[in-house]
Each structure stands twice: as structure tokens, then as C-alpha cells.
Swiss-Prot record:
<feature type="transmembrane region" description="Helical">
    <location>
        <begin position="477"/>
        <end position="497"/>
    </location>
</feature>
<feature type="topological domain" description="Extracellular">
    <location>
        <begin position="460"/>
        <end position="476"/>
    </location>
</feature>
<keyword id="KW-0406">Ion transport</keyword>
<feature type="transmembrane region" description="Helical">
    <location>
        <begin position="340"/>
        <end position="360"/>
    </location>
</feature>
<feature type="transmembrane region" description="Helical">
    <location>
        <begin position="418"/>
        <end position="438"/>
    </location>
</feature>
<protein>
    <recommendedName>
        <fullName>Potassium transporter 2</fullName>
    </recommendedName>
</protein>
<feature type="topological domain" description="Extracellular">
    <location>
        <begin position="239"/>
        <end position="265"/>
    </location>
</feature>
<dbReference type="InterPro" id="IPR053952">
    <property type="entry name" value="K_trans_C"/>
</dbReference>
<feature type="transmembrane region" description="Helical">
    <location>
        <begin position="295"/>
        <end position="315"/>
    </location>
</feature>
<dbReference type="InterPro" id="IPR003855">
    <property type="entry name" value="K+_transporter"/>
</dbReference>
<feature type="topological domain" description="Cytoplasmic">
    <location>
        <begin position="215"/>
        <end position="217"/>
    </location>
</feature>
<keyword id="KW-0813">Transport</keyword>
<feature type="topological domain" description="Extracellular">
    <location>
        <begin position="175"/>
        <end position="193"/>
    </location>
</feature>
<feature type="transmembrane region" description="Helical">
    <location>
        <begin position="154"/>
        <end position="174"/>
    </location>
</feature>
<feature type="transmembrane region" description="Helical">
    <location>
        <begin position="22"/>
        <end position="42"/>
    </location>
</feature>
<feature type="topological domain" description="Cytoplasmic">
    <location>
        <begin position="498"/>
        <end position="794"/>
    </location>
</feature>
<feature type="transmembrane region" description="Helical">
    <location>
        <begin position="439"/>
        <end position="459"/>
    </location>
</feature>
Length: 794
């Protein structure tokens, strides 16, 4: 949509175009967001009436279950998600990590290493809410003071992440199995039990095998399939209401819930584990918020998905209230008119595949986010579309999910056990979202704690009721998501814990700048042509792996760049703000530092574009740095020799911006002060890229007292030195680039506890050996790779 439309056509035309775009997004969201939620009528009633309760002539059970389904759909997806949780977005992004990122920006509870104050200057980092009040500052201070709460918060987020992964395994199994189960009405029992499982497994194998092609080629048919399915189930539901029981609307009264529990007692409470499946997929509304927007998801659910689901469930309840002795027990397909059975079966299978595809893609996305925040072992991430952001494929995870999904389908063989397992995973994710949203209400929205407590108690009690009912089915399938989440949580926490310890080891063993400056021919050190990119997690100082490299191979490249690729707690980092560049040592040393910042949903560049852009940023920095030096030298008349011994030995990291070539067109800039490791006050000025005629540049301003001893040189000499430095950079680029990475072996300190030794010596090293190396994550070509062996004692 053209943002200038309103200026050209008037506000009325602009509003019309805006609503047209929102409605289009709402339509497209059907295939991505609501596939899983829309197919739940296939198995809700069948799971609920599996064993715990029986259908009686009085219809109290049917009416009670219908009342529970209606109020659960109304309170959780509609009230909680559509009107509250969707507003807790992180720059338009949703999901567990979005909530965690939002909290970490308002409260210092992040466990991410190499955090810099300069990160707060990012445009996506801005805190738009009013200053904190007394009530939320108390909560903030309490959270920041107790370090164990930081770990507890991370564990809570990891729990939600692990349950999403478990849901990615269970949802395809139960969705496809329930859809294919419609064949039971057209087959004998003997043939049915030998046909459904193979057909389900075949569909699942095809589904996972096609993942590497991406969904962008067939994604345009997802929305029509789900729309057709919603119209189909709502139409059948309306027909059943009119045909069998027009008074089924009475079941919407909450009194039937209490009557149901009073009659069925413990059995009714245990049957809630099947009822909760009606909200399977509701979390996708928040998790996929970044692909659409708040208005589109709200409109699609409120005016289409919600009414269609209510009609579908009411239609099933109306049919079952008049058929107490069905030969095929209770299920979705018994309420479908016989003339529509085969078309509905075909649409149901297609809709189940679409719903499964959405949760599989969501699993890939959340694992990629976990990896970017250092909470998951390195895996290969393939971007399946150059046009659509976020379309990724992870081979290892895909095949693991496929094997486990088929194993679960063959092992459980019925909707009851699959529903018990899926329900527990779904409810655990919702509980995590409720807890994190209550923190957002206090810390980010600055609302009174009593409001957050009311939100937590109201929705938390509903979800705990369902969660407790799911736990009672532990031996009947609910053990699976608990086991899976435990395994994944151990893997993620061990990886994150050891990664933090490695960073602390690097921080303690970094080498001083003086050591680097002392390296020269007198010590037998030679400089070879080319650019050496030394990758490190440190944002200051010289990493120990470089000193080890020089010790074993007394040579390094003519142009040396210490590169730190780091993640910041924002979803995206604008390209104009991604690079922070600075000098390491004096000008003639040709050493630089570059910090590359990515958000947890950013797409990492391939090595060719990264290398080209990095050299471009270095060239821009060199030009502007010499321009600034010349101005300061002309104004202050300070000596270059003094500068080299003092100021240039200080590390200063700067940000990249775009500014106009013309002097009279200066963009608005924001300044933020921060201290480097030498306690020098720097000022970073960052601006948004201009729409036309712009060149990427770097602005770097230093306090005047940092150059007290600097002398002045002539403009001609400065230009000559500038050209010389740029020629050296160009020559080094033509000579080739080498990527220097550490190859780590980690072991626990002597005297460490048994748990720590198991986690570090066996757990982490096993994961490191069997997962992708850092060169794969950074997409480094093997021909340009130099690995330095490092032993970390943590």
C-alpha cells in the first residue's frame, strides 16, 4: 500500500485502501494462523467422550461439554488473545521470545552476554511507554536484584519453547490421523484398522519430505482451503442445528457446566483434557503476529473463525443430542450428511495438512530464534524464499520431527492418546504466555500490579484447571510432551549455560591492546597480504584465540578486523544500524573492530554479501574518520604523535548511518553516550537512511578532552594518508579474506560438582561434536577458514 496515498487522494480514499489491505491480510491469515485451530472439531468430542464420561439420554453430558467448549473459546482465544495478548507485541512480533525480549528491554534480567549500552540506541529498542511509576519500579528492582529470578524467567521461556516443539510433533499426528479416520464409516472394522495408520503415515512422510521446497510456491492455496473448510463445517453445523435440535443454543448457558461437573464429578473433570483441544492452535494467533497485523488477526477470528467454530460444535452437539446409540460412537463424521461425506473427507485432509504445515513452520521459526539467542545448538538454517521473510527450513529438525511423528502415530494408534499428549503441550504454552503477559502488564505497560495479578489469576486458573485434567492422563499419553520438553530443556539449558561460561572465560583471558601494538618485525611477526577477520564474542579487547594463533603462526594479515556477531533483544535490527565500527590501535596498524548486530528474527547474510558490506563499511568509516580528524586538527592544532600514544590506543565503537552528500541536507540524528573499556566518553550519532541520493557513512564524535595532545597536519598530508589507507584496504581485499574462528574444547574446572561435570564435559561436548560448527552458522567457505584450537576451563 502506498503510504502517500492519503496526500494524493484524500483521507477517505486512504482509509478505504487501508481497510482493503487489512481485509486482504485477514483473508491470508486463515491459511497461516487458523489452520490448526479450525480442524479441532474433528477430534474434540471424540476425545472428550473417549472413556471418562458416557453419553446419556438426558443430554446433560452433551450440553455440559458444549457449554465448556463455548466458554473456553470465548474466554481464551477471543478475550485473552484477541483483545489482550495480541497487544503485547514486540515491534509487531509475537510469541514467547517476543514477550521475553520486551521484558528484557525494560528490566535488566537478560542472560545474554556482550550487552552494550549502545544497543539501546537502536530504533527498534525504543521504549515508547511513559516512565515507570512507583508500583512497577518496586517489581523491577526486585527482579533485577535477585539473580535466580533471571534464571527462573529463562527456564520459563525455555519451557514454553520446548512445549511448542512438542506441539510441532503432536499436531500433525493428531490432525492428519483424525481427518483420515473418516474412512471408518465406509470400511469394516477389520479393514479400517489396517488402512488408517498406513495412509496417515504416508501423508506425514509426504508433508515432511516437501518441507525443503518451502511453502511460498503453494502458500497461496492455504487460505482458500481453510476458508472452504470453515464454510463447510459451519454450514454442516447450521444444518444439524435446524434439522436435529434448534434448542441447542440453551447449552451456551454456563449453568450447564456446573450441572455437568455435579453429575460426572471426577470423571467430568478428567474429561476436560479432551475439551481443551478446542483451543489447540490459539497460540498461533500471537506467534504469527509478525506475518500480519493486529487488526487482520482480530477481524479474521472475531468475524469468521469464531462464529464458524461455534456453529460447528453446536451442530455436532445437536446431532448427538438426538442420536444416543450411534454405531460408530461419537465423532465428527457421524454428523456429516452421507451425500457430503467424501467431499468433506477430502477437504478435512487438506485442511489438516495446512494446519500441520503452519505448526511445522512455527517450530522451525522458534528453534531459529532460540539459536540466535544462544539457547539452542547450532543447526543449519536454509531460507527457502528470497522474497518472503521468515520462510526457513531446518533439515535436522525436520527429519527428527518426521521420525518422531510417525513413531507417535504408530505407537498411540488412536485419537484419545494423541489428544492427551497434545492437550498438555498446548496448555503448558498458554500458561507460560499468561505468566509472561502479566509481567508485561506491570513492567512494560506500567499498569498497577493488581491488574496484572487479576489477569494472572483469572486466566491462569482456567488454564490450570485444564492443565491439571491433562496431568491425570499421564499414563495415557500425557507423558510424551513432558518427556520431550524435559529432554529439550536439558539440551537448551546446558548449551546456554556453557555458552555463557565460555564468554566469561574469554572475558577473563582477553589480551591487552598494548600486546597487539607490540607485535612487529622485531619479534619475528610478519604481516601478510589480505584481510583477516577474527571472529569473537567479545566487544572489547583482543580475544585469546588470536594471541594463540599468533603464538603458533607468527604472522597475521595486513588488515585485521575483530568481528563480533551478536544478538540483541529486538526482533529486527535495521540495516542502517547493524554495523558498529571502530579502530583498534593507531592508524598505521590497520586494525579495526566491527560489531554486527542481529535481532532474534533477522536473516543472517551469506558470506559474500557480508564480506562485501563489511569492507564497504570499513571504507566509509575510514573516509569519515579522516574527515573528522582533519577538522579537529585544523581547529585544535594538536600533535599526531601524542594522539597515537593516547587516543588511538583507546577502543571506540561507532554506528553506521546514511547521510546526504549535500552539506545542506543533514538528517535528524540521535546521540547516546556510553563508555568504552578505557572509560572514554563516546557519542554515537545515528540517523535513518534518506530516501534518495544517500551513501552509507559513519558519524563519530568524541569529546574534545579526548584529543588534548593532538596536533594539526596539513590537509594535503591527511588526504594522502586517507588515500593510502583506502589503497591498503582495497589491496587487502583483492589479496583475499581469511576467516579466523576458534575451535573450542570445553571442560569443567577441577572441584566442580558432578552435575556441572556431566553437563559440560559430556553434555555440551557431545552437542558440539554432533551439531553444526560456528563456520556453518556464519556461512564461512571452507577454503577461507582458519580454525584455532582453544581449551576452555569453565
Amino acid at each position: 500500500m502506498d503510504l502517500n496515498l492519503g496526500k494524493c487522494c484524500g483521507s477517505r480514499s486512504s482509509k478505504k485502501e487501508s481497510w482493503r489491505s487489512v481485509l486482504l491480510l485477514a483473508y491470508q491469515s486463515l491459511g497461516v494462523v487458523y489452520g490448526d485451530l479450525s480442524i479441532s472439531p474433528l477430534y474434540v468430542f471424540k476425545s472428550t467422550f473417549a472413556e471418562d464420561i458416557q453419553h446419556s439420554e438426558t443430554n446433560e453430558e452433551i450440553y455440559g461439554v458444549m457449554s465448556f467448549v463455548f466458554w473456553t473459546l470465548t474466554l481464551v482465544p477471543l478475550l485473552k488473545y484477541v483483545f489482550i495478548v495480541l497487544r503485547a507485541d514486540d515491534n509487531g512480533e509475537g510469541g514467547t521470545f517476543a514477550l521475553y525480549s520486551l521484558i528484557c528491554r525494560h528490566v535488566k534480567v537478560s542472560l545474554l552476554p556482550n550487552r552494550q549500552v549502545s544497543d539501546e540506541a537502536l530504533s527498534t529498542y525504543k521504549l515508547e511507554h511513559p516512565p515507570e511509576k512507583n508500583h512497577d519500579s518496586c517489581v523491577k528492582r526486585y527482579l533485577e536484584k535477585h539473580k535466580w529470578l533471571h534464571t527462573a524467567l529463562l527456564l520459563l521461556v525455555l519451557l514454553g519453547t520446548c512445549m511448542v516443539i512438542g506441539d510441532g510433533l503432536l499436531t500433525p499426528a493428531i490432525s492428519v490421523f483424525s481427518a483420515v479416520s473418516g474412512l471408518e464409516l465406509n470400511m469394516s472394522k477389520e479393514h479400517h484398522q489396517y488402512a488408517v495408520i498406513p495412509i496417515t503415515c504416508f501423508i506425514l512422510v509426504c508433508l515432511f519430505s516437501l518441507q525443503h521446497f518451502g511453502t511460498h510456491r503453494v502458500g497461496f492455496v492455504f487460505a482458500p482451503i481453510v476458508l472452504t473448510w470453515l464454510l463447510c463445517i459451519s454450514g454442516i453445523g447450521l444444518y444439524n442445528i435446524i434439522q436435529w435440535n434448534p434448542h441447542i443454543y440453551k447449552a451456551l448457558s454456563p449453568t450447564y457446566m456446573f450441572m455437568f461437573l455435579r453429575k460426572t464429578r471426577v470423571s467430568g473433570w478428567m474429561s476436560l483434557g479432551g475439551i481443551l483441544l478446542c483451543i489447540t492452535g490459539a497460540e498461533a494467533m500471537f506467534a504469527d503476529l509478525g506475518h500480519f497485523n493486529y487488526a487482520a488477526i482480530q477481524i479474521a477470528f472475531t468475524f469468521l473463525v469464531y462464529p464458524a467454530l461455534i456453529l460447528a460444535y453446536m451442530g455436532q452437539a445437536a446431532y448427538l443430542s438426538r442420536h444416543h446409540h450411534s454405531a460408530h460412537a461419537i465423532g465428527f463424521y457421524v454428523s456429516v450428511p452421507k451425500c457430503l461425506h467424501w467431499p468433506v473427507l477430502a477437504v478435512a485432509i487438506l485442511a489438516s495438512v495446512v494446519g500441520s504445515q503452519a505448526i511445522i513452520s512455527g517450530t522451525f521459526s522458534i528453534i531459529n530464534q532460540s539459536q540466535s539467542l544462544g539457547c539452542f545448538p547450532r543447526v543449519k538454517v536454509i531460507h527457502t524464499s528470497d522474497k518472503m521473510h521468515g520462510q526457513i527450513y531446518i533439515p535436522e529438525i525436520n527429519w527428527m520431527l518426521m521420525i518422531l511423528c510417525i513413531a507417535v502415530t504408530i505407537g498411540f494408534r488412536d485419537v484419545k492418546h494423541l489428544g492427551n499428549a497434545s492437550g498438555l503441550a498446548v496448555m503448558a504454552v498458554m500458561l507460560v504466555t499468561t505468566c509472561l503477559t502479566s509481567l508485561v502488564i506491570v513492567l512494560c505497560w506500567h499498569k498497577p500490579p493488581i491488574l496484572a495479578l487479576a489477569f494472572l489469576l483469572f486466566f491462569g486458573s482456567i488454564e490450570l484447571l485444564y492443565f491439571s485434567a491433562s496431568l491425570t492422563k499421564f499414563r495415557e499419553g500425557a507423558w510424551l510432551p513432558i518427556l520431550l520438553s524435559l529432554i529439550f530443556m536439558i539440551i537448551m539449558f546446558v548449551w546456554h549455560y556453557t555458552t555463557i561460561k565460555k564468554y566469561e572465560f574469554d572475558l577473563q583471558n582477553k589480551v591487552s591492546l598494548e600486546w597487539l601494538l607490540a607485535l612487529g618485525p622485531s619479534l619475528g611477526i610478519s604481516r601478510v597480504p589480505g584481510i583477516g577477520l577474527v571472529f569473537t564474542d567479545l566487544t572489547s579487547g583482543i580475544p585469546a584465540n588470536f594471541s594463540r594463533f599468533v603464538t603458533n603462526l607468527p604472522a597475521f594479515h595486513r588488515v585485521l578486523v575483530f568481528v563480533c556477531v551478536k544478538s540483541v533483544p529486538v526482533p529486527f535490527v535495521p540495516p542502517a544500524e547493524r554495523y558498529l565500527v571502530g579502530r583498534v590501535g593507531p592508524v598505521d596498524h590497520r586494525s579495526y573492530r566491527c560489531i554486527v548486530r542481529y535481532g532474534y528474527r533477522d536473516v543472517h547474510q551469506d558470506v559474500d554479501s557480508f564480506e562485501t558490506e563489511l569492507v564497504s563499511k570499513l571504507a566509509d568509516f575510514i573516509r569519515y574518520d579522516w574527515h573528522k580528524r582533519t577538522q579537529q586538527e585544523d581547529d585544535n592544532a594538536r600533535s599526531v604523535q601524542s594522539n597515537e600514544s593516547s587516543s588511538e590506543s583507546r577502543l571506540a565503537v561507532i554506528g553506521t548511518v546514511a547521510y546526504e552528500i549535500e552539506d545542506n541536507l543533514q538528517p535528524e540524528s540521535v546521540s547516546i553516550g556510553f563508555s568504552t573499556v578505557e572509560s572514554m566518553e563516546d557519542v554515537i550519532q545515528m540517523a535513518e537512511p534518506a530516501p534518495t541520493a544517500t551513501i552509507r557513512r559513519v558519524r563519530f564524535a568524541v569529546e574534545e578532552n579526548s584529543y588534548e595532545d593532538e596536533g594539526s597536519t596539513s590537509s594535503a598530508e591527511a588526504d594522502a594518508e586517507l588515500r593510502s589507507e583506502l589503497r591498503d584496504l582495497l589491496a587487502a581485499q583483492e589479496a583475499g579474506t581469511a576467516f579466523i574462528l576458534g575451535h573450542s574444547h570445553v571442560k569443567a574446572k577441577q572441584g566442580s560438582s558432578v552435575m556441572k561435570r556431566l553437563a559440560v564435559n559430556f553434555g555440551y561436548n557431545f552437542l558440539r561434536r554432533n551439531c553444526r560448527g560456528p563456520d556453518v552458522a556464519l556461512k564461512v567457505p571452507p577454503v577461507s577458514l582458519l580454525e584455532v584450537g582453544m581449551v576452555y576451563v569453565v
